[in-house]
Amino acid sequence: LLCISCCVSITECCQLMSGCAVEIKS
């Protein structure tokens, strides 16, 4: 799965602000 984030850091967004991130199938 790839993570598309509306935050600056994709990793931080996925871990800390999941509500700001969207997981999609690759």
Curated annotation (Swiss-Prot):
Keyword field contains Thylakoid: no
Tissue: Expressed by the venom duct.
Endpoints of the signal sequence: none
GO cellular component, one term: extracellular region
UniProt key word Disulfide bond: yes
Keyword vocabulary terms for this entry: Disulfide bond, Ion channel impairing toxin, Neurotoxin, Secreted, Toxin
Subcellular localization: Secreted
MF annotations from Gene Ontology: ion channel regulator activity; toxin activity
Top-level division of the source organism's lineage: Eukaryota
PTM per Swiss-Prot/TrEMBL: Contains 3 disulfide bonds.
Written domain comment of the UniProt record: The cysteine framework is C-CC-CC-C.
Function: Acts as a neurotoxin by inhibiting an ion channel.
Listed name of the protein: Turripeptide OL49
Lineage: Eukaryota, Metazoa, Spiralia, Lophotrochozoa, Mollusca
